[in-house]
Amino acid sequence: MNDTPQTLEKDVRDNLLLLYDFDKDYDVKLLKYSENVIFKITFKEAFPVVLRIHRPGYHNIEELEGEILWMDEIHRDTDVELPVVYRGRDGRFLQKMTTFSGEEVYVSVISFLEGSPLGELKDDELIKGLESLGEITAKLHMQSINRDKIGRAHV
């Protein structure tokens, strides 16, 4: 990606309301700038969301859509707490945005889930978190087995 975090933040500010039906009063904060660029969008009158700018050329549109559709299925079919994926104004999960440098990128928006980085947890919290991770992994394993049985494609 040829854009800086600052120009991408401006791109998000300029395009968010064109792509999604969100409240006009919001704040944008960069959370992570790496292979994907992640912004937290905080609204005055609604719950925060996360906007992800997907790294261009890393995954094609079918792979990105597959990942999002699987998240949506997991959310619907299990009790695993996952972010809700938001659809854009056009009804699609993935939206195309042109950056300041002219590069076309895909963006997606999910609900924000509170959490703490693993490195900040105390030992007892870490053990509890890892036990929970094991339970979630088992549920995801069962969901993927059931997904295969009903003929849903692999992501």
Language-model regions, residue ranges each:
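N-proximal short alpha-helices
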Residues: T4-T7, D11, V37, Y58, ...
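ATP-binding glycine-rich phosphate-binding loop
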Residues: Y20-F43
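Short N-terminal amphipathic alpha-helix/helix-capping patch enriched in small hydrophobics
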Residues: V12-R13, S34-V37, E67
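Alpha-helix N-cap/helix-start motif at coil-to-helix transitions, marked by capping-box chemistry
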Residues: Q6-T7, K32, E104, E131
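ATP-binding pocket architecture of kinase catalytic cores
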Residues: K44-D148
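Juxta-kinase regulatory segment immediately upstream of eukaryotic protein kinase catalytic domains
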Residues: M1-V28
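Conserved small/polar residues in nucleotide/adenosyl-binding loops
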Residues: A153-V155
